[in-house]
């Protein structure tokens, strides 16, 4: 029997996934060190932006950067990325990964020093062409992901 579920995985499924992943990783001398994070930036006690993501193995992933429309192009996105980079730079991670669509912010990430790794073109709707970026830490002391 095969089942499809929409939405978050049940606790039973999460437990199974964690157990199998952990066993496999340990057999290969790897540890995922997975955790989710969020960073908020405020002005006058109001949240104006959020950067959220997760870490796994030796990498930091950015899932969302959202700035309220009234605060865009005022440097808040750059401040969030800089805070993220400073937070993880000396914590044993190798790099930060993020992706964005054509209609979002590919040039913003390039201006922030992120290198384009590849582009996945959407031939039906070019606005949904996906850009994948990375920024490597210069710190050679990478120890995350090793058990």
Q: Where do the PLM segments sit?
A:
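Conserved N-terminal entry element of GNAT/NAT acetyltransferase domains
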Residues: 1-10, 138-147
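Acetyl-CoA-dependent GNAT
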Residues: 3-63, 103, 120
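Conserved active-site tyrosine of GNAT-family acetyltransferases
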Residues: 17, 109-110, 114
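A conserved beta-turn-beta hairpin within the catalytic core of GNAT-like acetyltransferases
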Residues: 55-63, 72, 125-129
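Hydrophobic adenine-recognition pocket in adenosine-nucleotide-binding enzymes
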Residues: 65-67
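Conserved acetyl-CoA pyrophosphate-binding loop and the N-cap/start of the following alpha-helix
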Residues: 71, 75-83
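Conserved GNAT acetyl-CoA-binding A-motif
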Residues: 88-102
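Conserved catalytic-core motifs of GNAT/GCN5-like acyltransferases
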Residues: 97-99, 115-132
């Amino acid at each position: 029997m095969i089942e499809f579920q929409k939405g978050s995985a049940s606790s039973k499924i999460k437990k199974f996934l964690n157990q199998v992943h952990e066993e496999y990783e340990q057999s290969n001398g790897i540890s995922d060190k997975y955790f989710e994070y969020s960073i908020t930036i405020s002005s006058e006690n109001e949240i104006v932006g959020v950067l959220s993501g997760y870490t796994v193995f030796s990498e930091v992933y950015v899932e969302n950067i959202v700035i309220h429309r009234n605060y865009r192009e005022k440097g808040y996105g750059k401040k969030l990325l800089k805070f993220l980079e400073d937070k993880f730079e000396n914590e044993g991670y190798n790099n930060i990964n993020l992706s964005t669509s054509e209609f979002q912010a590919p040039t913003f990430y390039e201006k922030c020093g992120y290198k384009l790794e590849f582009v996945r073109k959407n031939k039906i709707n070019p606005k949904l062409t996906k850009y994948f970026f990375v920024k490597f830490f210069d710190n050679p002391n990478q120890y995350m992901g090793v058990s």
